[in-house]
Amino acid sequence: MIKMFVMPTCPYCDYVEKQVEGNPRFEVIDISKHVHNLQMFIDLRDNNPAFDEAKKIGDIGIPCYVLEDGTVTLS
């Protein structure tokens, strides 16, 4: 299953969330819904080099995808 970290106020997240709606291969995790979700995302963002460029330019790094093999991608 592909995990997708999103937030409703992010326009890019809204777009991709609609694209995967109803697809059982995706688990959509809203980081604004519960502090546990936010903590999972922060841990990922703080420890994964996939976020280095996003952090350099001041982006949050969502939407973010964690593929089945553990690969993290922002695209």
Predicted feature residues:
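Catalytic Cys-His active-site segments of thiol-dependent hydrolases/isopeptidases
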Residues: 75
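Thiol/disulfide oxidoreductase modules built on the thioredoxin-like
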Residues: 54-61
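Local sequence-structure signature of Cys/Sec-based thiol-disulfide redox active-site neighborhoods
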Residues: 1-31
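A short, hydrophobic beta-strand/beta-hairpin element that forms part of a small beta-sheet core
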Residues: 61-72
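Major-groove DNA-recognition helix of helix-turn-helix-type DNA-binding domains
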Residues: 50-51
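Thiol-based oxidoreductase modules, predominantly thioredoxin-like and allied folds used
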Residues: 25-47
